[in-house]
A protein has these predicted regions:
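A structural boundary/capping signal
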Residues: 1-149
Length: 149
């Protein structure tokens, strides 16, 4: 799964042009919902929060293949890293790590870890983007969203 930076950046730029931030509480009525945004809303925007942004970018970088996406997560070539504003123990934001570079809905472009660290601290445990954490968060939020219906 080889992708040059030009194509990678074009995918991110295309997604960014239609991205609209919305808190999970406002969108789903729950504090945390990890979800891939597959389709735009009625206004043509991809709507979600930082976790949704990271997951949705990764999914698109993997040619919209769940198998490729989970392969990258399991082999630690990609990860959804949790970061915080105040210290390495409090989590308040999610960042995509993809093949050694990072992107989030604040920077909106790939860059080094140091770019993210200007505003955030990587969580002492969950800042590495382990696949099990992503799987658990996605599963739990799917169950909660389903039960709320």
């Amino acid at each position: 799964m080889k992708m040059d930076n030009k194509r990678r950046d074009a995918i991110v730029q295309s997604f960014n042009s239609r991205w609209k931030y919305r808190y999970d509480k406002d969108q789903y009525g729950m504090a945390d919902a990890w979800k891939i945004i597959y389709t735009p809303d009625i206004e043509g925007n991809y709507v979600g929060d930082c976790e949704d942004y990271a997951l949705s970018i990764l999914y698109r970088l993997c040619d919209e293949s769940h198998i490729k996406m989970w392969w990258l997560l399991i082999t630690h070539q990609a990860g959804i890293c949790l970061v915080g504003r105040k210290n390495k123990w409090k989590v308040s934001h999610a960042v995509l790590r993809y093949k050694g570079e990072y992107v989030d809905n604040w920077t909106k472009k790939f860059g080094p870890k140091s770019e993210i660290e200007k505003n955030h601290h990587f969580h002492v445990f969950h800042g590495y983007g382990w696949a099990y954490m992503t799987a658990l968060k996605m599963l739990i939020s799917k169950i909660v969203r389903t039960l709320k219906k």
